[in-house]
Amino acid sequence: MDESRPIFIQIAEQVENDIIEGALPEGSQIPSTNEFAAFLRVNPATALKGVNRLVDDGIVEKRRGIGMFVTAGARERLIERRRAEFATLYLRPLIVEAEKLGIDIDELAGLLRAERIQS
């Protein structure tokens, strides 16, 4: 866990990552808050706060007496949201810096391709 960020956010993000990567497909049950709490050694209320964040975002749904399940369309919604965040956090600053340095879009694309090959 990352000490600099709230644990409940990290729990929600891990479930989101598992959904995006296909480890938790739509309709599948996610671990219970008690399972999260035991595995991560955190207070069950902290785990519940992370899961409730996913419920509030419509990513998982509660099924009374059964558990929490990934909703239909959750993966697509998460990818759409992450793409928008990616553009805001990374692409816009990258483009601004490239313009300052006189790097045009074609050169920038070439730099990105070269970097991708190296990684």
Which sequence ranges carry the predicted segments?
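Generic hydrophobic secondary-structure packing signal
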Residues: 43-46, 83, 94
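Short glycine-rich loop/turn motifs that provide flexible caps or phosphate-binding loops at active sites
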Residues: 21, 26, 49, 64-66
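A surface-exposed regulatory interaction patch that couples sensing to output
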Residues: 71-88, 92
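Short, mixed-charge, low-aromatic patches
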Residues: 4-10, 46-54, 66-71
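Extreme N-terminal segment that seeds HTH/winged-HTH DNA-binding domains in transcriptional regulators
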Residues: 1-29, 35, 85-119
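N-terminal helix-turn-helix
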Residues: 29-62
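Short secondary-structure transition/capping segments
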Residues: 40, 74-75, 118-119
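Short, Lys/Arg-rich nucleic-acid/phosphate-binding segment
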Residues: 29-30, 62-75
